[in-house]
Amino acid sequence: MLFKALLFSLIVSPLVTAHGKVSVITGDAGGNTTALAIQGGIVPGPGKNSVTEVDTTVFRKTNILSDGLGRTTGQGANKVKMLAQAIALSGDTLPQVSDNGTISGVFHIVTTDGAGPVKAVLDPTGTGAFSQGTMLRTVTQVPGKHGNIAAPQQRSLHMRALVAMGIVKRAANVNEDFPVEFSVPAGTTCSGTINGINNVCLVKIANSNKAGPFGGVVAIQMASQVGSNNDTAVSTKCGRAFIA
């Protein structure tokens, strides 16, 4: 009976269970945002991986200097137009970064394979062309080794048996937040336009776990470019973004 139960678990359990995501990023000159495709409080912290991982971005390559915005299980391929969704969650003002300033925020480790260390690369065109981007210096790092972190002590007999048999990978729910911070080089300018918002850069933050990699993409602006006429002032009524 136990063997049959374990076989049933093999059928219904995902084989790759690992995730970490960018919950919020703030600029040193103000403003904040979430990563593209983040769904907010409707996604629980603890629980089954199939429920807790739906808005975690997975990238195709472990090399941080690779193009693309990644994808989530909840919404499929990430798109720049999802910035409207991020603004609806976080407010009208994107992270504003001063010259030689920083971005900081929260990296949420969902499961044990979604940990640090993480890296960040900035795309000044706001299109996801990260292969041509600029690496950011890490100021505050997310804990972990090769994208892994120690699992919680409490694990069910059911899960221990599945792990021992090699049926599922060793990725238990962690549900913990960790601070992260990156330095943006002096002289950085943003040329992207997303949903009518000008002067936008995209920043990819991700670990290098081969099961993923996992992380997220956030939009930022350089405060000196925005000035007194804030290009992030938009309306999100009816789920649409308009210039204010």
Segments from the language model and where they lie:
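Intrinsic-disorder/low-complexity, polar/charged segments enriched in Ser/Thr/Lys/Arg/Asp/Glu/Gln
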Residues: 102-104, 177-179, 215
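Short beta-strand elements
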Residues: 213-244
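Exoplasmic/lumenal beta-rich domain surfaces
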Residues: 128-183
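Extracellular Ig-like/FN3 beta-sandwich strand-entry sites
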Residues: 100-102, 115, 198-200
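Short edge beta-strand/loop segments characteristic of extracellular beta-sandwich folds
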Residues: 104-110
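Fungal secretory targeting signals
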Residues: 1-24, 238-244
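N-terminal "mature-chain" segments and other terminal, solvent-exposed stretches
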Residues: 17-99, 113, 121, 125-130
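Internal, hydrophobic beta-strand segments that form the core of beta-sheet-rich folds
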Residues: 181-212, 217, 221
